[in-house]
Amino acid sequence: MNAELQALKERRSVRKYKADMVPQEMIDQVIDAGLYAASGHGEQDSIIVAVTNKEVRDKLSKMNRAIMGTKSDTFYGAPVVLIVLAPKSNKNAIYDASLIMGNLMQAAHAVGLGSCRINRAKEEFASEEGKQLLKEWGIEGEYEGVGHCILGYADGTVPQAAPRKANRVFYVK
């Protein structure tokens, strides 16, 4: 099997991270790969907000926990949160942003980082508190949260892939 296909199969979601900050160069490499995701008609209008500020990261975690209804850190201790947002004006942008999320996670794996997709970005950034954060960050326009890609160094062994479920592919010949 070629290396690219093998990498797709080996990437796992990491749910326990070391506190060590990821070097900016690695974060930039992951983001750059995310920006190369396909987008309908080449629009390239979904955006990424890279959060490395611990205070802001912790605030986002608190918001996310409240939506989920849990007291535990929904970012699993990861020091970096990449928020992917799609413009509400583009009906296909959510799909484009989802491709960005996939590229971010694969790129993290490629550079030796752990990652995990975290949901509830839609609810976070639909809230008044979330809208205020976007405004504070200088992000103008109407955006919908698509997901958080958390990044960091895995703390412990990365889990093996679960067996793939059967009957998920249908061929029409």
Residue ranges and their predicted role:
Residues 1-173:
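Acidic, surface-exposed loops and disordered segments
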